[in-house]
Amino acid sequence: MKPHLKQWRQRMLFGIFVWGLLFLAIFIYFTNSNPAAPMPSSFSFLERRGLLPLQGKQRVIMGALQEPSLPRSLDASKVLLDSHPENPFHPWPGDPQKWDQAPNGFDNGDEFFTSQVGRKSQSAFYPEEDSYFFVADQPELYHHRQGALELPSPGETSWRSGPVQPKQKLLHPRRGSLPEEAYDSDMLSASMSRAFLYRLWKGAVSSKMLNPRLQKAMRYYMSFNKHGVRFRRRGRREATRTGPELLCEMRRRVRVRTLDGREAPFSGLGWRPLVPGVPLSQLHPRGLSSCAVVMSAGAILNSSLGEEIDSHDAVLRFNSAPTRGYEKDVGNKTTVRIINSQILANPSHHFIDSALYKDVILVAWDPAPYSANLNLWYKKPDYNLFTPYIQHRRKYPTQPFYILHPKFIWQLWDIIQENTREKIQPNPPSSGFIGILIMMSMCKEVHVYEYIPSVRQTELCHYHELYYDAACTLGAYHPLLYEKLLVQRLNTGTQADLHHKGKVVLPGFQTLRCPVTSPNNTHS
């Protein structure tokens, strides 16, 4: 009898041990998971204002952060302006004083990143040879556990649309709903601490300062290389160009180009008489005097910039960004509207009949292969913008409506990459950057609002949608961070306007006085 009793006790102890392990595993799983975080789609990295998610449709942005945004009260804004990087809200690793001592905010090569990251990494730098190629293999999928990302396979969803999800799941929890310990140093340093914003204003930030989730998403797109980017460096990198030097280089190279119906396959499809007779670049041959580019960032709310915006000769807006109900902050005038291809392709946006897209100059775009192969693009666009374009042109033949040529879009990408010391995402620039360059080609002076965020910076993606995500400001699919750093170098406006209004002032290309020949003029 005793042996049986002993065996029974052993089995009971073993069962208790197994149940204990199971309970521990379940406890660890639920404590490490983040059920409040939205599941990301395969793109959805819409920039904060350029490729707008449209009204009534929510998206998930990969690399989304679940941190609270900066306080938007006047007192908080004043504190931000009065603060000094040597006494930041949450200091970055390394000595902040080095930023002020080094020219252009940089020390030298590897040391700059080493001091910020705490370890040496060469992955962000160009190789020594004159060209490099992005990897084009299938990347490893990340999982949405313990703060990581789960990225669907490239064929599952488009680069600009994610699954529609209940709105409440897309919103950040408010500060009052989270325990105090949730606001730890990881959250504050994630994307837009006071120190980070200060350095963004100075142009002294890098991707190594982004939170790990955005960095992971950026690495994903680096390895995926959907558009087949094969960048060849033609001359030395010019990340240290001065603002005037960079402006002259851009003036020499940037030529706004749209489909004119002369190239195959469009020439064989009868597009020549369909497109506007006057090219976009010649609509205002004498140039507009003063123009505004109004980003759709949530930070523009409570800005009272509407009257100033409407005072410009021309105003550019993006996608479905409305003015009705927001006139005090964004104004009412719209001259040009840049729209992504989803607006044309998705019937829910009522592109043909909506008043939002009437009585304005329309400029549409869709990502094409880096090779700018028009035949391949026509057969497989991200969204079929060609059919609705034809329908719109036939119904409203007098309205100026253009489709940007892929070569123009990728030319802008080349300029960003050549003037950036890091490898940037091999994806098209944001609509915001495209719009800025178009207006610099058409206007004598361009005022850009809330592209580089002001003290009102918030993770609210767009002023007309209750949707929060840090990736809207710093990007992950688009090379937004690098675009902003480049525009910061071009800014001729005041620091006060940048801080309080989020306003950057850029000269139009036609007003520049550049040397006839330049020693750096090595690009074709």
Curated annotation (Swiss-Prot):
Lumenal topological domain: 33-524
Catalysed reactions listed for this entry: a beta-D-galactoside + CMP-N-acetyl-beta-neuraminate = an N-acetyl-alpha-neuraminyl-(2->6)-beta-D-galactosyl derivative + CMP + H(+)
Tissue expression pattern: Mainly expressed in brain and embryo. Very low expression is also detected in spleen, oviduct, lung and skeletal muscle.
Location in or out of the cell: Golgi apparatus, Golgi stack membrane
SUPFAM superfamilies: Glycoside hydrolase/deacetylase (SSF88713)
Gene3D superfamilies recorded: Glycosyl transferase family 29
Aminoacyl-tRNA synthetase recorded as keyword: no
Glycosylation sites: 302, 332, 520
Signal sequence residues: none
Alphabetic keyword roster: Disulfide bond, Glycoprotein, Glycosyltransferase, Golgi apparatus, Membrane, Signal-anchor, Transferase, Transmembrane, Transmembrane helix
Record-linked Pfam families: Glyco_transf_29
Entry's Gene Ontology molecular function annotations: beta-galactoside alpha-2,6-sialyltransferase activity; sialyltransferase activity
EC number(s) on file: 2.4.3.1
Membrane topology listed for this record: Single-pass type II membrane protein
Disordered: region residues: 152-174
Cytoplasmic side, ranges: 1-11
Domain of life the protein comes from: Eukaryota
Transmembrane segments: 12-32
GO BP terms, alphabetized: N-acetylneuraminate metabolic process; oligosaccharide metabolic process; protein glycosylation
GO CC, alphabetical: Golgi cisterna membrane
Cysteine disulfide links: 248-514, 291-443, 461-472
Protein family (similarity comment): Belongs to the glycosyltransferase 29 family.
PANTHER family attached to this UniProt entry: BETA-GALACTOSIDE ALPHA-2,6-SIALYLTRANSFERASE (PTHR46059), BETA-GALACTOSIDE ALPHA-2,6-SIALYLTRANSFERASE 2 (PTHR46059:SF3)
Functional description taken from the UniProt entry: Transfers sialic acid from the donor of substrate CMP-sialic acid to galactose containing acceptor substrates. Has alpha-2,6-sialyltransferase activity toward oligosaccharides that have the Gal-beta-1,4-GlcNAc sequence at the non-reducing end of their carbohydrate groups, but it has weak or no activities toward glycoproteins and glycolipids.
Protein name stated in the entry: Beta-galactoside alpha-2,6-sialyltransferase 2
The organism of origin for this protein: Mus musculus (Mouse)
